Amino acid sequence: MERRRVTSATRRSYVSSSEMVVGGRRLGPGTRLSLARMPPPLPARVDFSLAGALNSGFKETRASERAEMMELNDRFASYIEKVRFLEQQNKALAAELNQLRAKEPTKLADVYQAELRELRLRLDQLTANSARLEVERDNLAQDLGTLRQKLQDETNQRLEAENNLAAYRQEADEATLARLDLERKIESLEEEIRFLRKIHEEEVRELQEQLAQQQVHVEMDVAKPDLTAALREIRTQYEAVASSNMHEAEEWYRSKFADLNDAAARNAELLRQAKHEANDYRRQLQALTCDLESLRGTNESLERQMREQEERHAREAASYQEALARLEEEGQSLKDEMARHLQEYQDLLNVKLALDIEIATYRKLLEGEENRITIPVQTFSNLQIRETSLDTKSVSEGHLKRNIVVKTVEMRDGEVIKESKQEHKDVM
């Protein structure tokens, strides 16, 4: 934002002559004649953010003032020439008048003398009025240009302030959107963590505890800068200063043209006020610069926090993926080992079943052979025969149910005196 202070210092030119008459007054040697004008009110705001632009504007202002000063000096030199010419004519007329006075006065000479005095007085008045009107015209033209420039500067400043406000609002909206995006990412990651934890909470309880310890709650507290109030306050101050300056300008234009000594004192007071306003504007500029730096720091902090959150969530997601892959590998290895143990157990049961069948077959064969062989009855008096029968059934879902029946027969003298049956169940 560039604002230029256009100041017009009091312009003076000094003339020293032997004698001249201005406005009916005779000025002696060493008399100082100065022309001055009131400076226009200063702009309400100055921006020193761009030193280069300020220096160039200051140089242009100084150059324009120097050119105006030279033009005024040239114009005043022409006025001096006219005054000298009039002085010479005055001297000539005075010499002629002295010559006429040396002669015998007549009525015609008195008439000429009175008319001459009247003409001189009118000439002095016209000359003074002409010079005053020309100076006033130049001052009014320059003041009009200054007011137009000031109006343009005020319009540019207002547009720039509105653009800055829109930019600040856009930055605030972007920061809010970034914060909401981060919150949504955090919620999605937390839901994914809860889902993974719920799936594996029964099988891997120890991993669930580790995940619970590693859970990170992120809370972000973003300070929302109150830009609207600050800009409203600045605009209020700006409008107040602009209104005050406009009021002072109107009062100055309605007031009469003051004499040169009062103008010098007034210019000194205005210069002091200008310096004071420049200091105020410097302080305002520093405050706005601090606010801008604060907003930039807040933006950088938000971006840094966003990057840290993304990196941390990426690391956590990678660790969760690795843990999930490791658990899947462990589960697969456990399933493989369980299947291998089941297969070994099934093989052992099959071997045991085959052995039991062979034992039962041998016993039946042995009992048949014993029944065919003739043996004295006394030898079988205490004989106990144990008969074992095997009943196998297939059960659904891959389980094998086996019933083993042990039958005991007690015979004496070829007669069965006692018989018992015992059943054993085995499931595999």
UniProtKB/Swiss-Prot annotation:
- Citrulline, modified sites: R26, R32, R266, R402, R412
Question: Which residue intervals make up region (Head)?
Answer: 1-68
Record's keyword terms, sorted: Citrullination, Coiled coil, Cytoplasm, Intermediate filament, Methylation, Phosphoprotein
- Positions of the UniProt region annotated as Linker 1: 101-111
Which InterPro entries does this one have? IF_conserved, IF_rod_dom, Intermed_filament_DNA-bd, Intermediate_filament
Any single GO CC term annotated in Swiss-Prot or TrEMBL for this entry: cell projection
* Major place of residence: cytoplasm
Q: Protein name, please?
A: Glial fibrillary acidic protein
From what organism does this protein derive?
Answer: Bos taurus
Please name the gene that encodes this protein.
GFAP
